[in-house]
């Protein structure tokens, strides 16, 4: 879709800043990757994390040591509108944030 909404992780971060206690089981946490991997019964070499978030999807895949594909038409799309080299754009995003991953593959959309 065209609209981008805050993720549950964003809401948890805000809640924690207000003094609330959180326990996140989701990307980029290793628990969710372990859960999915244990259900799959395949080697890590056959797993590909597809996502639009350098912070959650790609970083999580990097931590779990699986390949990843970044879809640039998602939450970071405003950065990828330019005709710059995608890796240069990712470096610029990395300079502004912690916990960002490096994708193995990049494409605009899944078709």
Language-model features: locations:
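Asp-based, Mg2+/Mn2+-dependent phosphohydrolase catalytic module
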Residues: 1-111
